Regions:
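Catalytic beta-strand/loop module used to bind and position nucleotide/cofactor moieties
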Residues: 124
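Extended accessory regions or peripheral subdomains of proteins
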Residues: 2-49, 54-95, 131-207
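FAD-binding glycine-rich core of flavoenzymes that anchor FAD
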Residues: 98-119
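Short coil/turn segments at secondary-structure boundaries
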Residues: 52-56, 116-121
């Protein structure tokens, strides 16, 4: 058995890394008897993960299902302030008007690259906006006490995505490489980290 075949060689990866700082790298495997739900149970997703099933027209199962795992960044709003959680670090971002604008500012630091062979969706900020977010835009009466004490919105950015092709019965295991600088050492480290995450994920799927 030869070495794993990734979607981009290191030389190709270097070229894409010149254009942005988030480069998706993937390896394709056969789904065999795996389903999105069974894969979700196997991977090390912790508290931050999602499974998106594709439906067309409300009843037709679409081609792709998406499973996101591993959250290097979580952004949520609480009492008008934003909090950015990266690993063990939690940073409070003071409120300055619309919290969605603060979220936009955070997202502007990420410059994703589009590579061939992937569907339009390969990750990004995935989460929810609560009903009470309407108070950000409209002058409404004070809301009642929230017994659940949930954030008004929360989004996570995952660095591993499983893309199930329900037609071809294949899985693309995608790792998003975050290139922190344009130096050769940083690019090489980002590529190596992405391949290692891909292989760890595949190993968990094959247990």
């Amino acid at each position: 058995m030869g070495p794993p075949q990734y979607s981009l060689s290191f030389d190709q990866f270097q070229q894409y890394a010149k254009k942005g700082n988030l480069v998706p790298l993937y390896r394709e495997i056969l789904a065999d008897y795996e389903t999105p739900v069974s894969a979700f149970a196997k991977i090390d997703h912790g508290p931050s993960a999602y499974l998106l099933e594709s439906i067309e027209g409300g009843e037709k199962w679409a081609r792709y299902s998406f499973l996101g795992s591993g959250a290097p960044a979580v952004v949520y709003e609480e009492q008008g302030d934003l909090f950015l959680v990266q690993g063990a670090r939690k940073k409070r971002i003071a409120s300055r008007g619309n919290p969605l604008e603060r979220l936009r500012e955070i997202m502007e630091s990420y410059r994703p690259i589009t590579v061939p062979g992937l569907p339009p969706f390969v990750g990004g900020a995935v989460g929810y906006l609560s009903y009470d977010m309407v108070r950000t835009f409209e002058d409404l009466p004070a809301r009642q006490k929230d017994p659940l004490n949930l954030p008004d919105f929360a989004f996570l950015l995952t660095d591993i995505m499983l893309i199930f092709d329900n037609v071809a019965q294949k899985i693309k295991v995608v790792a998003t490489a975050h290139v922190t600088s344009k130096g050769p050492r940083a690019i090489k480290s980002a590529y190596r980290s992405a391949t290692e995450r891909i292989e760890r994920t595949i190993a968990r799927l094959r247990r």
